[in-house]
Structures are given as structure tokens and as C-alpha cells.
């Protein structure tokens, strides 16, 4: 029997189905489990780094860097920016706040000029969201995170896109995976829409945990369960220390 964390790991893996040969940058343990699972199953061409400056030829467990003689390529910081601008990258970040149009906040809570709590700053969010596919992992789906409007825009959402400005043509806020379900921005005016709800989650659960309307909740499918082979990979190969369980509130 699979846990909620393992269902979420599979949902994160599905972010990369049919991605082809692109660089994947998972910024959380859950997203890293998903990326490794995808690479070991249906997306063998995706590229992963060791978190420093090398592309991995193998797919080590979380916290491991693989054999030193199994390096696939060189990816120093400068080349990351080249890849980012080229668009052949999909990043999965966290979000302290996300709104109905996919704006993300990891910078600060409160008014921009007088924030009540400082966080990371915008970091790479602006460059990520304007150049290539960006998804978000949220381990605690609640109204404090899924807000009507973010306090500070770190990563841009669809309501910030100027259709007459070619600089915005690559914006692709792809999906949000939370502990309750999977969501995209296929609703009216690129607003949030339910793609699937995890087993045991009801539309009412999502409504109660979200500060805005999520479209198509009642029509959402059930998130698929991991196969036996996927469960083995998650538990024994990718994440034997069960780090995935620390990121989720079931």
C-alpha cells in the first residue's frame, strides 16, 4: 500500500513525462524523488546535476552524488544561466504563497515596503518563470499558502504576462503539486484548475484549504498510484531514508 508521500512523488515524476533531453532542477526532496523516479522509468533522457557543477550519468539516492567516474557533463553556474535562457530546463521550486494565476512568493510576508517577515528573497524565480517551465511543490496545502494574491511576486504568474511583449512568450507555469492534488492553469484566464486529487482527498478538502476558487474540482481525476516497481524504486533505491515523509502534511 502506498503512502500519501509516495503518491506525491509519482505526481512529481509525472511533471517530466515526455520532457525529452532537458535539464531538471528539483529544489526540494519530494521533487528530487520525483525527478529520479522519472529518470529511472519513463524519462531516461532528462539531465540531473549533483547540485554543484556536474551532470550525473547515474541516478543516485537522495544525498548521494554517484560514482566519481560516472559524470555525464560539466554544468558550472555560468552554463546553468545559458541553459536557463535557452529554455531547455524545468525547475520545481517551493512556494510560501501561490495564487490563482500562478504567482509565487518566497520573498517576504506583508506589504512590500514594510514586510512583517523576511524569507529567501526572490532568488531565481523571475528568471525561471520568464524563460522555461516552472512547477511548484507544496507539502502543506492550506489557505496561508494558496492565497487570493501573493504579498510579493517572486515568480510571475499568468496575470503578469503582457501578450504584446515578446519577453513573456516563454512563460510556462506548468503545474502545482501539493499534498492534496495536482493543479495546472487551464482555467479561465489561465487560472488554477484541478488536474487530479490524491486518493482519499475530496473536492471539499481542497475548497476548505484554498483561498480562491479552483476550477474543475468536481471533474478532477484521481492521482494515479505508484506501481509495484515504482514503490520499490522509491523505497529501496531513491529514498531509503524516507526523506519524502518529512515534507508532507497528510
Curated annotation (Swiss-Prot):
GO molecular function, one term: CoA-transferase activity
Domain of life according to the entry: Bacteria
SUPFAM superfamilies linked: NagB/RpiA/CoA transferase-like
Reactions performed catalytically: (3E)-2-(2-carboxylatoethyl)-3-methyl-6-oxocyclohex-1-ene-1-carboxyl-CoA + H2O = 6-methyl-3,7-dioxodecanedioyl-CoA
EC number(s) stated in the UniProt entry for this protein: 4.1.99.-
Bilayer-crossing regions: none
Keywords from the named record: Cholesterol metabolism, Lipid metabolism, Lyase, Steroid metabolism, Sterol metabolism
Pathway assigned to this chain's UniProt record: Steroid metabolism; cholesterol degradation
Family to which this protein belongs: Belongs to the 3-oxoacid CoA-transferase subunit B family.
Protein name: Cholesterol ring-cleaving hydrolase IpdB subunit
Quaternary state and interactors: Heterotetramer composed of 2 IpdA subunits and 2 IpdB subunits.
Source organism (scientific name): Mycobacterium tuberculosis (strain ATCC 25618 / H37Rv)
Key word Zinc-finger present: no
Outcome of gene disruption: IpdAB double deletion mutant does not grow on cholesterol, but grows as the wild-type on glycerol. In the presence of cholesterol, ipdAB double deletion mutant accumulates COCHEA-CoA. Double mutant does not survive in macrophages and displays severely depleted CoASH levels that correlate with a cholesterol-dependent toxicity.
GO biological process per UniProt: biological process involved in interaction with host; cholesterol catabolic process
The protein's role, per its UniProt record: Involved in the final steps of cholesterol and steroid degradation. Opens the last steroid ring of cholesterol by catalyzing the hydrolysis of (3E)-2-(2-carboxylatoethyl)-3-methyl-6-oxocyclohex-1-ene-1-carboxyl-CoA (COCHEA-CoA) to 6-methyl-3,7-dioxodecanedioyl-CoA (MeDODA-CoA).
